[in-house]
């Protein structure tokens, strides 16, 4: 299972929308809920979390420099095409490594 974290300013409404977008993207590629889990966090909380992948904007990515995870930045967190292009290769690489 690949753990992802959608990071936004407050970790509330916009984070939930981003989480749902990530879930739709991964489901569109045929992945099920046993392949991934998406959490939501504000930037302060995110630094103490341990997902495999953070998805956020470049503004918040600067605060995640020292984490031990992939940090994927997107310009528009609500654009599912952009999310898809940004995360799918890294997601599949991590998932395949975990299945070995």
Positions of PLM-derived features:
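Short polar/charged helix/loop
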Residues: 2-100
